[in-house]
C-alpha cells in the first residue's frame, strides 16, 4: 500500500537539502529514488518540510536509513526529522 511521508527538518535549510540531493545522485525535476513515487520540498518558518509518497513504509524506511539519515548528518542538518506517516487512499499523476 502506498504511504505518504511528511518530514519536518527543524533548523535545516534548502541549501543543505540541495547538497543532500546531490549526494544521493539526484537532480531537480529528475527521476526520484526507486520506490519513491512523488517528492517535493518547501521552506518553512523553522526549517524545511519534505512530502513524499512511497510504495510502502518499509521501502521508505530502508531509504531513510541508507541515505536520508547519513547524508543529512553529513551536510549538517541540526536535528533528525519529525516524521509522520499517512496511508494513501488515492493519488493522481500529471497527464
Question: Where are the regions that the model predicts?
Answer:
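Mid-chain, well-packed structural core segment of small domains
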Residues: 71-72
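Short S/T/G/P-rich N-terminal loop/turn motif that feeds into the first structured element of a domain
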Residues: 1-67, 76-95
Amino acid at each position: 500500500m502506498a504511504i505518504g511521508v511528511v518530514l519536518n527538518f527543524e533548523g535545516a535549510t534548502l541549501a543543505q537539502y540541495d547538497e543532500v540531493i546531490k549526494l544521493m545522485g539526484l537532480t531537480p525535476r529528475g527521476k526520484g529514488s526507486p520506490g519513491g513515487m512523488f517528492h517535493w520540498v518547501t521552506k518553512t518558518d523553522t526549517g524545511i518540510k519534505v512530502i513524499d509518497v512511497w510504495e510502502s513504509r518499509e521501502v521508505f524506511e530502508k531509504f531513510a536509513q541508507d541515505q536520508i539519515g547519513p547524508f543529512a548528518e553529513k551536510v549538517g542538518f541540526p536535528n533528525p526529522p519529525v516524521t509522520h506517516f499517512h496511508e494513501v487512499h488515492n493519488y493522481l499523476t500529471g497527464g
